[in-house]
A protein has these predicted regions:
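Conserved lysine of the Walker
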Residues: 45
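Hydrophobic anchor at the beta1->P-loop junction of P-loop NTPases
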Residues: 35-37
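Short phosphate-coordinating micro-motif centered on Lys-Gly-acidic
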Residues: 6, 104-172
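Conserved nucleotide-sensing/catalytic segment adjacent to the nucleotide-binding pocket
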Residues: 66-115
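P-loop (Walker A) phosphate-binding loop of NTP-binding proteins
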Residues: 40
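Phosphate-binding P-loop
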Residues: 26-32
Length: 172
């Protein structure tokens, strides 16, 4: 049974807000942490992932583009600490391809960011940060982020979401 520990909806987020949420999250991520990013094409999933990875690039004074793994499925970054793996399952067509990727090994050795996690089917991890991007181009291009902690026990992650909620509520 999957336990939803905590959740919150951040409404009307622009790209600067999304980047700030990603930057704050980057400060607490450790090997074994998994982020599942859901949402339609163009909602900001890749942008969010790049913002997180870029924060670590800055720490290590790495100045290079962060490509989307849309065609390669996986992009790893083992030149930073913690090591990152960015997975984009959009183009994956068969569940048998998941076995070839070796996600269990990736989960144990990297901070893992997965776009289009719906394609994981029954292979979803037991614990993860679920971030759903809700994008409405018909209403002033509004973007909402729904963040849920699924099976998470990390006090740092709970504190991150609690602090984020508090700061957000003070702004509205």
């Amino acid at each position: 049974m999957t336990l939803i520990s905590e959740k919150f909806l951040f409404k009307n987020q622009n790209s600067s807000d999304v980047a700030l949420i990603a930057q704050r999250l980057s400060k607490i991520l450790e090997i074994g942490d998994i982020l599942l990013l859901k949402g339609p094409v163009g909602a900001g999933k890749s942008f969010f992932a790049r913002c997180i990875i870029n924060e670590f690039f800055k720490k290590f004074k790495i100045y290079e583009d962060i490509p989307s793994p849309s065609f390669s499925l996986i992009q790893t970054y083992d030149n930073i600490k913690p090591k990152f793996c960015h997975v984009d399952l959009y183009r994956m067509s068969f569940s048998s391809e998941l076995e070839e990727i070796g996600l269990d090994n990736i989960y144990e050795n990297f901070v893992t960011i997965i776009e289009w996690p719906e394609r994981l089917g029954t292979k979803k991890p037991n614990r993860y940060i679920n971030i759903k991007f809700i994008y409405d181009k018909n209403v002033n291009y509004e973007r909402h982020l729904k963040i849920s902690l699924i099976g998470i026990e990390s006090k740092k992650i709970f504190k991150w979401l609690k602090d984020l909620k508090k700061d957000y509520e003070e702004l509205i």
